[in-house]
Amino acid sequence: MRLVIAQCTVDYVGRLTAHLPSARRLLLFKADGSVSVHADDRAYKPLNWMSPPCRLVEQADGETPVWVVENKAGEQLRITVEAIEHDSSHELGVDPGLVKDGVEAHLQALLAEHVELLGAGYTLVRREYMTPIGPVDLLCRDEQGRSVAVEIKRRGEIDGVEQLTRYLELLNRDSLLAPVAGVFAAQQIKPQARTLATDRGIRCLTLDYDKMRGMDSDEFRLF
């Protein structure tokens, strides 16, 4: 991973245009090919980013370097670097990934075993289906053979919806899978998370862990 702290302007050129005026920012260039631009707020969310695969070309506009990040669709992030305060590269190695807590891992196993709880005619394609940013819990097919990505949480919060949204964005770029729908499944889903999921066309499924362990009933609340 390459970390750069620089005074820079950033322009996105693609389906839309967006401009970030000159400011000190953190630029992350990851080994997977992704590039993201961060400020000292917004928590983990970047100001702008380019998902992999993409390539970086360093050009010059007079004496000012311009780093052009371009994806396969021809969209570009044009980073005009006015001054560099820090530039370092670090080898992080292969990450073992997020280890789910016991309840989430068991929920995933139970739902994979009884995938029909997602709906009549559903079939499991794979557990822990890998994407460039991590594994989605379940990849399934619905009764019409369409792809469905399922993210499972013990407590359904906005972060989980954002995580599934990023998975869906990447999965829908795969012509062998697209279109890919999303299901956000949890024991309890907070109202704000449900509202965000609904707005993004993601279906919410409330799971009863005790019933799933005993499988005494097929009745689940589906919203």
Curated annotation (Swiss-Prot):
GO molecular-function term, one example from the UniProt record: single-stranded DNA endodeoxyribonuclease activity
EC number: 3.1.-.-
Location (main, coarse): cytoplasm
Subcellular location: Cytoplasm
Gene Ontology CC: cytoplasm
Enzymatic class: hydrolase
Keyword annotations from UniProtKB, A to Z: Cytoplasm, DNA-binding, Endonuclease, Hydrolase, Nuclease
Gene3D superfamilies from the UniProt entry: 2.70.180.20, 3.40.1350.10
Cited Pfam families: NucS_C, NucS_N
Keyword match Phosphoprotein: no
Family assignment from sequence similarity: Belongs to the NucS endonuclease family.
Function: Cleaves both 3' and 5' ssDNA extremities of branched DNA structures.
PANTHER family to which the protein is assigned, alphabetical: ENDONUCLEASE NUCS
NCBIfam families tied to this protein: PRK03298.1
Protein name: Endonuclease NucS
